[in-house]
Design a protein with these regions (language model features):
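Extended, low-polarity transmembrane helix blocks
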Residues: 1-31, 44-50, 54, 61-141
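Transmembrane alpha-helix entry/boundary detector in multi-pass membrane proteins
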Residues: 38-44
Length: 141
C-alpha cells in the first residue's frame, strides 16, 4: 500500500506517462515513428496525429494541462464514436448494442484515454509540471 503522502507524486507520474503514450500515438500518425506509418498530410488521421502529438507533449510536461487534456478527451470521444462505432462496428454489421461495446469495435484505447484525460482536466497539472512551476493557482486553466 502506498502512503497517502505520495499521492501527488504518483499522480505526476501518471500524468507524465499518459502524456508520453499519447505523444507516441501522435508521432506514429504524423511521422511513422515507433512502428507506425505516417498518415497522408491532409487527412483526418494526420489531424488526429497533430492533436495527439501536441496535447500529449503539453500534458507530459504539464503546460496548459487542463485545456490540452480537455481537447484530448474530446478527440478521443470523437474517435470512439466516429471511427470505432460508426465506421468499424457498422462496417462489421455489429449493430446495436454490440457495436457500442469497446471490446467489439476496437475502441478500448479511445474510451480509456477519453476518461483519463477528463480526469487529468479536472485535476490539473500537479507536481513536476511547468504549470506548477509558473505558480498557477489550483482550479485555474
Amino acid at each position: 500500500m502506498i502512503p497517502e503522502r505520495y499521492a501527488p507524486y504518483t499522480y505526476a507520474l501518471f500524468r507524465i506517462v499518459v502524456g508520453m503514450l499519447f505523444f507516441f500515438f501522435g508521432m506514429q500518425k504524423l511521422a511513422g515513428w515507433f512502428g507506425g506509418q505516417a498518415a497522408p498530410l491532409m487527412s483526418l488521421q494526420s489531424a488526429a496525429g497533430l492533436v495527439e502529438t501536441v496535447c500529449g507533449f503539453l500534458i507530459m510536461v504539464g503546460l496548459f494541462t487542463r485545456p490540452a487534456a480537455f481537447l484530448a478527451s474530446g478527440e478521443m470521444a470523437v474517435a470512439f464514436w466516429y471511427i470505432h462505432v460508426f465506421t468499424i462496428a457498422m462496417g462489421k454489421g455489429l449493430g446495436f448494442p454490440a457495436g457500442l461495446v469497446p471490446q467489439n469495435n476496437g475502441g478500448v484505447d479511445a474510451v480509456l484515454f477519453c476518461f483519463t484525460f477528463l480526469y487529468i482536466c479536472s485535476r490539473g497539472a500537479g507536481l513536476l509540471s511547468i504549470d506548477g512551476a509558473m505558480g498557477k493557482p489550483r482550479g485555474v486553466l
